[in-house]
Amino acid sequence: MRNGNLAGLLAEQASEAGWYDRPAFYAADVVTHGQIHDGAARLGEVLRNRGLSSGDRVLLCLPDSPDLVQLLLACLARGVMAFLANPELHRDDHALAARNTEPALVVTSDALRDRFQPSRVAEAAELMSEAARVAPGGYEPMGGDALAYATYTSGTTGPPKAAIHRHADPLTFVDAMCRKALRLTPEDTGLCSARMYFAYGLGNSVWFPLATGGSAVINSAPVTPEAAAILSARFGPSVLYGVPNFFARVIDSCSPDSFRSLRCVVSAGEALELGLAERLMEFFGGIPILDGIGSTEVGQTFVSNRVDEWRLGTLGRVLPPYEIRVVAPDGTTAGPGVEGDLWVRGPAIAKGYWNRPDSPVANEGWLDTRDRVCIDSDGWVTYRCRADDTEVIGGVNVDPREVERLIIEDEAVAEAAVVAVRESTGASTLQAFLVATSGATIDGSVMRDLHRGLLNRLSAFKVPHRFAVVDRLPRTPNGKLVRGALRKQSPTKPIWELSLTEPGSGVRAQRDDLSASNMTIAGGNDGGATLRERLVALRQERQRLVVDAVCAEAAKMLGEPDPWSVDQDLAFSELGFDSQMTVTLCKRLAAVTGLRLPETVGWDYGSISGLAQYLEAELAGGHGRLKSAGPVNSGATGLWAIEEQLNKVEELVAVIADGEKQRVADRLRALLGTIAGSEAGLGKLIQAASTPDEIFQLIDSELGK
């Protein structure tokens, strides 16, 4: 039976295909396929000499380099399981990885060796030196199902987990992605922004070139957009692999001239928004822009666009031999165009997570990716969001990526992330974090245009209430957005903020001890202003203050720096307020005034001036109001005129002596009898109301109908 050892299979294939003298890696030096396999066989012998054997574990904590590739293959050659760790992590994370894997050997750099147990650590340089003095070793006989290596998940749903892969796994996703999607040949050279210790980078930079006879450009330092431009101009790669965040920065900071050698661009890690994909098409001169989806558990991409068949705005179609299904909330398979959870099944899915009881696969070998997608009748997959990205606002699910797609259409915005944040009241509201495009400024004017644009294109509950400009968004080392971190932080540079107060109880507005009966009126009728004159002056000042307050809150929501630039007589809808904004304005005014306001009061009174008149009456202690600010009848006998007179009566009643209030109450009873006519029910209410406060409540409940 043929040996299933992956290192041996790759070396055998390179020899038989005549690739030994072809470049495999472009780094500080050009390293051929033959040099890689010869060096790996020698390093395997070094591991054997150090006492390592089949079943042992090695932790590789190194930057990208041809040495790392040879060390990985050496582990596989000897049947040793390799764990690829990120060397840029904190020392505590490295200590955790070492405790979790209990490696027989840690291979790292001089700068990091003090982070690990001295008796188990070796520098890569010393192993390479030893390898130069030994003969190449053989390949441990292994079955295809034998454990080979582990890469760590990105950590978007908790602490990273080491997903275990077998010797046969890379051959599966090499066949799916390299041959079926990208059509890679020995003439292709790849350049990848993701590092080798991630599944995406490991496939693109190691398994793909080794399995196809092609090559990869390797950089020991992170591949920034600027570094990618320099490396591309120097080595002329044909395929550029990256994540959307990386590509957005390439457009922002690089010249297309550096990338003229490319025949296609491959994106993964997060869905590539249609707007960004179109910009990439223009930037790279119309070459295929291929989005796809994979996972650490699968090992590489399993749904992708292909160089000979691709659609912007989609993830492409499933790559054989994988199977996918979209699962509805009830567990059934969703129909075409129906959103659900993406499940995948295939031969390369991880066997499990190291040192953890949970398994990545569910029933009958299916893996729930926790990505929400829909599939059309032709099999094209469109990404929606992460299952754990969905935000809930007021009991309604919101896909934040729908909002983000619209925000980044603005040229001033390079990146956007929308999350739900918890207000001090306990209510949830959406908040947008924005990263400005290089050289651009996101100021109040840009923000106002963004906000109004979102209101025109989205339901109001999907529009963020708070915005902040930040220098960068929190991401995992391989570029995935960490929404959980954003949910925990407050904006560092707030652009504007709608602070929601406790929702009203639904009862009619009530005053909080602000009526004239609780004020001390100085002076009497001897020479000074009369009581009536003082009350009129008091009301005029109160009206001015209330109008100022309403204008100020409305201006904040509209992004207007000058409150008085807002037209007080225009309808709220003409000012740009929708129903949600109007409700929010009333909640803000409730917090400012201390009143409890019905949520519909803004629409009831229609404009800033109408709402201000209503609020002024409430603050004066008035309860007798109507449901419309406009007159119901024409002339002075209209209900609006009656309400105005009742307001004046209430102001006077508030300051008369207690002994006079009973006489006023009697008059009001008689008035109510006249209004009600022969209605027996109202007559009973009048008889039961024995105090002025009860009379006023009766006016509120009966005349306000």
Curated annotation (Swiss-Prot):
GO terms for molecular function: acid-thiol ligase activity; ligase activity; phosphopantetheine binding. Pathway: Lipid metabolism; fatty acid biosynthesis. GO terms for cellular component: membrane. It is an enzyme of class 6 (ligase). It comes from the Bacteria. The modification O-(pantetheine 4'-phosphoryl)serine is found at S579. Its EC number is 6.2.1.50. Keywords: Fatty acid metabolism, Ligase, Lipid metabolism, Phosphopantetheine, Phosphoprotein. The keyword Transmembrane helix does not apply. Residues 541-619 form the Carrier domain. GO terms for biological process: Actinobacterium-type cell wall biogenesis; fatty acid biosynthetic process; glycolipid biosynthetic process; lipid biosynthetic process; phenolic phthiocerol biosynthetic process; secondary metabolite biosynthetic process. It catalyses: holo-[4-hydroxyphenylalkanoate synthase] + 4-hydroxybenzoate + ATP = 4-hydroxyphenyl-[4-hydroxyphenylalkanoate synthase] + AMP + diphosphate; 4-hydroxybenzoate + ATP + H(+) = 4-hydroxybenzoyl-5'-AMP + diphosphate. Disruption phenotype: Disruption of fadD22 abolishes the production of PPOL. Gene3D superfamilies: 3.30.300.30, ACP-like, N-terminal domain of ligase-like. Pfam families: AMP-binding, AMP-binding_C, PP-binding. Belongs to the ATP-dependent AMP-binding enzyme family. Catalyzes the adenylation of p-hydroxybenzoic acid (pHBA) to form p-hydroxybenzoic acid-AMP (pHBA-AMP), which is converted directly to p-hydroxybenzoyl-S-FadD22 (pHBA-S-FAdD22) thioester intermediate in a CoA-independent manner by attack of the phosphopantetheine thiol of FadD22. Usually, this intermediate primes the biosynthesis of the phenolphthiocerol (PPOL) by presenting the pHBA starter unit for elongation by Pks15/1, but M.tuberculosis lacks Pks15/1 due to a natural frameshift and thus is unable to produce PPOL. This is p-hydroxybenzoic acid--AMP ligase FadD22. It comes from Mycobacterium tuberculosis (strain ATCC 25618 / H37Rv). The lineage of its organism: Bacteria, Bacillati, Actinomycetota, Actinomycetes, Mycobacteriales. The gene is fadD22.
